[in-house]
């Protein structure tokens, strides 16, 4: 037998037992005539002692180096009271080694487990990086999450049904990864960006509660929290309303946090998209941050200051204020840095006002813009934002998008910089009632979620007549500023689906070519249905306390969508390309 126990599982209950351990040398120390090693496996570390009583094992131990793969047979003994290590789960015991076998030696490592390595090193030698206890713990947590999800779904009547990986390219927002067909020359499969259409077809097939933990693929520019291939917890239901779907999913996330962290998330507040953008400048607000945006354009229409009266009198303008409590200590240098920061989002400047003494009116404030404000306007402003002595006010004034984006980002930065964001808290919420459509960079209408989302209380005729007023029956779950899941009630009426396609500029011929199977299926008694998908990678990020999605994926890609370990992607064999009728044109 190669193993009877895991290293990290040993404790006082095992004292006196003979054990066989298999794992790696984490560290070695020579103390006089004794040799100690910390031995590691996926469950943790235990101290092993080599004593002259077992001379053969001691002699062999002298050749051990870090990351040798070994087997130990010995007895679990109690550590002396003065040697108990309270920082280790196994710190009350050690193993007295009676025999030692070396499975495999290890060359000097290209990584140093005791120092920070570059991300490039970590990804190139990922198999070594994953040996680090913190990485092993993250992947164990991920496994616990998927185990919990499967149990929860099974208990609530959901069926785990697989959907195809090789499918048809359909417009879902990002670029597809294409797979050429050898049999059907010149034709391509697409790897799915999500199982969206297949799970809707399953609802039409009568499987009223579906789920799947599934790989999805998007060929898009990457960020710290994005990967070209990612994992979704995908869910779809029939005959449930949006609030009922949210209730089930909220219950699942409650259980997940309770089982993983021992944390009670409490009742999730529900907030409309409009309120989230107005108060926080984001559709995924981090409610740990107490700062809010307050609209003041109506108070500044008559001021003789172009920066303010322009947006104040523009129907598409916005002036928003962030009040920072006790912020008068913020220096001019810091204000200049914040001004540069909002410039990233298109803002042309950042006005500010320090409140030194409310009772003194104009004499009690300090600001380059104070000279443009009357006593009445100043008083109304200070009352609107509920200013207190010692506060500083920051003003954003521009078109609606620039002001909202810039001040929303500034709110987050101020929260971090000034220690206002309560990092130890968990603040979940639902965001609902998104716009059905938004304008893309060319000014055309695009679906804010996807083209299969149902509008709220709109007929096809009303939607076609006034699409920009439509609200989507959609919902996102947000935790600490991260969108962890999103979903919607789906369109189940063929006329409504065709109307949405037309609004998006998809003509009838293109509808038949790309979505003919869906439009046909909608004609045969399609039930009302709704669903949601969680990002498993992002959930695991939150539950393990990392801010890099690559830390919770065993073999992730870089921000250039490359695998440094296997050197993927690589050039294909010319013969294989010939069989696929694919020609590679070299870029000049």
Curated annotation (Swiss-Prot):
The EC number on file is: 6.1.1.12
- Main subcellular location: cytoplasm
Q: NCBIfam families under this entry?
A: aspS_bact (TIGR00459), PRK00476.1 (NF001750)
**Sequence similarity:** Belongs to the class-II aminoacyl-tRNA synthetase family. Type 1 subfamily.
GO cellular component labels: cytoplasm
Catalytic activity entry: tRNA(Asp) + L-aspartate + ATP = L-aspartyl-tRNA(Asp) + AMP + diphosphate
Q: Which UniProt keywords apply?
A: Aminoacyl-tRNA synthetase, ATP-binding, Cytoplasm, Ligase, Nucleotide-binding, Protein biosynthesis
A Pfam family per the record: tRNA_anti-codon
Q: What does this protein do?
A: Catalyzes the attachment of L-aspartate to tRNA(Asp) in a two-step reaction: L-aspartate is first activated by ATP to form Asp-AMP and then transferred to the acceptor end of tRNA(Asp).
Give the location in the cell: Cytoplasm
Keyword NAD attached? no
The subunit field of the Swiss-Prot or TrEMBL record says: Homodimer.
Which one GO biological process term can you cite for this protein? aspartyl-tRNA aminoacylation
> Mind telling me which InterPro entries this protein's record contains?
Aa-tRNA-synt_II, aa-tRNA-synth_II, aa-tRNA-synth_II/BPL/LPL, Asp-tRNA-ligase_1, Asp-tRNA-ligase_1_N, Asp/Asn-tRNA-synth_IIb, AspRS_core, GAD-like_sf
Q: What class of enzyme is it?
A: ligase
This protein's record includes keyword Membrane: no
* PANTHER family the record matches: ASPARTATE--TRNA LIGASE, MITOCHONDRIAL, ASPARTYL/LYSYL-TRNA SYNTHETASE
Return the annotated region ranges for Aspartate. Answer: 196-199
- The entry marks the following residues as binding L-aspartate, namely 172, 218, 449, 490
Q: Where does ATP bind?
A: 218-220, 227, 483, 535-538
Q: What is this protein called?
A: Aspartate--tRNA ligase
Give the Gene Ontology MF terms in alphabetical order: aspartate-tRNA ligase activity; ATP binding; nucleic acid binding
